[in-house]
Amino acid sequence: MKENITVAMLAELVDGEVIGDGEVLVGNFVSLETAGEGDITFLVKAGDQDLLTSTKAGAVIVHRKVEVESPATLIKVDDAYLAAAKIHTFLLEDEFSPEGIHRSAFVGEGCQISSEVTIKALVSIGNRVVIGPRTRIESGVAIGDDVTIGEDCLLKANVTIADGSQLGNGVTIHSGTVIGSDGYGYATDKMGFHYKRPQVGTVRVDDNVEIGANSCVDRATYGLTWIKSGAKIDNLVQIAHNVVVGENSLIVSQVGISGSTSLGRNVVMGGKAAAVGHLQIGDGVMIAGGSGVLSNLSAGAVVGGIPARPIKQWRKSVVLTTKLPEMQKDIRALKKSVEELAGKN
């Protein structure tokens, strides 16, 4: 972790404007409420601006429109949330110091492993594995045969990378996740018996992808399951065989994507959303949490509900649903009035 960095240096990283003393030294990124001398923090909610007048922080990242005076040095930016992420990451970065391969790790035959790696205790590495420089593999990771892992990767404890999987550069995979497990494919005969279809494809994970804990990315039946560059996948996500997740897409916890569905660039799937198989979901689509996607979606669509439909239409249906008990009373009263009128005739 970096210490004693000037505010001016941090502002330069994010194209920020310094208001106050740019030579103030900071090194610890904390919340606005707890920040003290030597700390840097950020303000996102406009309603919290009053905290700026009393903060003890060394520096605060704020939006350019904020005009409140503060004892702290301010860094004014166009997007405080984004700037905070960049600065926090910079402060936490350490120069990679390779520790080599732990004596309890197992390494198979024909492997090409950079000398600039850290491979912790009880890691198992299969045959013909390639691992690039500055990659860190933590305890209990299992790597199958013919796997390729690029530069600057991080595999947390107990990750499994199955045979033939390909990881690009800068990939982070958190504990318990399985890459390359068999896809779910069976053929059923007339008697109802299920016969497993061989799953002989692979998984490709491109550069700068991050996958959370306890998620599964299944290998393709044939060809590739493909997670493209910059995609960010949360914990507890299921990605089935032959799925394609487009560049910079965001897949939130408990999402399930069925086989052979393809997502475009910058798609967002909210928590617990699901998509059936063999769909085409266009660039920039946003799918509300808990939705069920049953048909193709054009680029830029914003949808919600089951089945997923345009977001305004779904919201209207939700409002109407909450009014059903009241509407039922009105219908009963109306029915009674009609029956009374009919009886008089």
From Swiss-Prot:
GO cellular component, one term: membrane
EC numbers for this chain: 2.3.1.191
GO biological process terms on file: lipid A biosynthetic process
GO molecular function, one term: N-acyltransferase activity
Top EC class, one word: transferase
Record Pfam families: Hexapep, LpxD
Pathway terms, separated by semicolons: Bacterial outer membrane biogenesis; LPS lipid A biosynthesis
InterPro entries from the UniProt entry: Hexapep (IPR001451), LpxD (IPR007691), Trimer_LpxA-like_sf (IPR011004), UDP_GlcNAc_AcTrfase_non-rep (IPR020573)
SUPFAM superfamilies: Trimeric LpxA-like enzymes
Catalytic reactions of this protein: a UDP-3-O-[(3R)-3-hydroxyacyl]-alpha-D-glucosamine + a (3R)-hydroxyacyl-[ACP] = a UDP-2-N,3-O-bis[(3R)-3-hydroxyacyl]-alpha-D-glucosamine + holo-[ACP] + H(+)
Sorted UniProt keywords: Acyltransferase, Lipid A biosynthesis, Lipid biosynthesis, Lipid metabolism, Repeat, Transferase
Residue numbers annotated as active site: H241
Listed CDD domains: LbH_LpxD
UniProt function note: Catalyzes the N-acylation of UDP-3-O-acylglucosamine using 3-hydroxyacyl-ACP as the acyl donor. Is involved in the biosynthesis of lipid A, a phosphorylated glycolipid that anchors the lipopolysaccharide to the outer membrane of the cell.
PANTHER family for this protein: UDP-3-O-ACYLGLUCOSAMINE N-ACYLTRANSFERASE, UDP-3-O-ACYLGLUCOSAMINE N-ACYLTRANSFERASE 1, MITOCHONDRIAL-RELATED
Subunit structure: Homotrimer.
Family per record: Belongs to the transferase hexapeptide repeat family. LpxD subfamily.
Protein name: UDP-3-O-acylglucosamine N-acyltransferase
Native source species: Desulfotalea psychrophila (strain LSv54 / DSM 12343)
